[in-house]
């Protein structure tokens, strides 16, 4: 029986509806961790004020590239910008690893008929978190590099590696072996993966648009809300990809 996107979408939404409480809690918890880590590692207000003093210069330099804008900063401002970027990247990476590990564990446990909470899912996922961390670090690096060179290569890399977290979690194989398997399966089933990835990207862009419309909320609360909504979108994509992989799962994989 052929695999259809409609069937996968229906299964994914059914799972989301049945496990909504656990998924919402997981999305909120990982969003809170992400925001708290970012607040802990971001430079202090005095340093940020030094960086924000250049905002008017950036606004008047609309035709310059990012590289040229950074080159115009003083060495002190460049160091502060690097700290801000590193804090945001690290906190987002940790939050995403916990979200992916917890979600994949939750999906796996529920598929086996076991009920688990969001906290239990994260706890059970601890053994696979180091491999997920390495995998997502490499994947993020490659995708960002592809987007920097040109947007299309970044999207292609994202599609190629989309199944690798599920493979690492379910097959307990190494990071690079999981990436290799993901590339083969993803390109062989690109018609089922690309539409879901495009919907995921579109949802993320809509959330970015909403950033400027949550000015009534304090910044930390707005950050948690937006991060939780973003995590919820990613959770739905993970359910879709997990279900797809279970239907495509090769029989010759050695665990």
UniProtKB/Swiss-Prot annotation:
The chain crosses the membrane at residues 22-42, 90-110, 118-138, 141-161, 192-212, 221-241. One of its GO terms (cellular component) is plasma membrane. Coiled coil: none annotated. It is found in: Cell inner membrane. It comes from the Bacteria. InterPro entries: UPF0259. Pfam families: UPF0259. The keyword Electron transport does not apply. It is a multi-pass membrane protein. Keywords: Cell inner membrane, Cell membrane, Membrane, Transmembrane, Transmembrane helix. Its main location: membrane. Belongs to the UPF0259 family. This is UPF0259 membrane protein YE2218. It comes from Yersinia enterocolitica serotype O:8 / biotype 1B (strain NCTC 13174 / 8081).
């Amino acid at each position: 029986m052929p695999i259809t996107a409609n069937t996968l979408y229906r299964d994914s939404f059914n799972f989301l509806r049945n496990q909504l409480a656990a998924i919402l809690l997981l999305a909120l918890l990982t969003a809170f961790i992400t925001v708290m880590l970012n607040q802990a590692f971001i430079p202090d207000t005095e340093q940020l004020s030094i960086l924000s003093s250049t905002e008017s210069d950036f606004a008047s330099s609309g035709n310059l590239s990012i590289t040229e804008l950074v080159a115009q900063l003083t060495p002190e401002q460049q160091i502060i910008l690097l700290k801000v970027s590193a804090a945001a990247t690290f906190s987002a990476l940790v939050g995403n690893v916990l979200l992916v590990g917890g979600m994949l564990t939750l999906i796996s446990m529920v598929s086996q008929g076991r009920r688990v909470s969001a906290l239990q899912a994260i706890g059970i996922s601890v053994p696979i978190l180091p491999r997920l961390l390495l995998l997502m670090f490499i994947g993020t690096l490659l995708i960002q590099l592809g987007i920097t060179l040109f947007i299309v290569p970044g999207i292609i890399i994202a599609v190629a590696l989309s199944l690798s977290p599920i493979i690492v979690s379910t097959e307990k194989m190494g990071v690079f072996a999981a990436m290799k398997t993901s590339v083969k399966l993803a390109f062989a089933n690109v018609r089922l993966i690309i539409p879901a990835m495009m919907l995921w990207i579109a949802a993320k862009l809509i959330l970015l648009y909403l950033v400027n419309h949550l000015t009534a909320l304090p910044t930390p609360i707005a950050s948690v809300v937006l991060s939780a909504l973003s995590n919820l979108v990613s959770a739905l994509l993970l359910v879709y990809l997990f279900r797809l992989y279970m239907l495509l799962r090769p029989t010759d994989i050695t665990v």
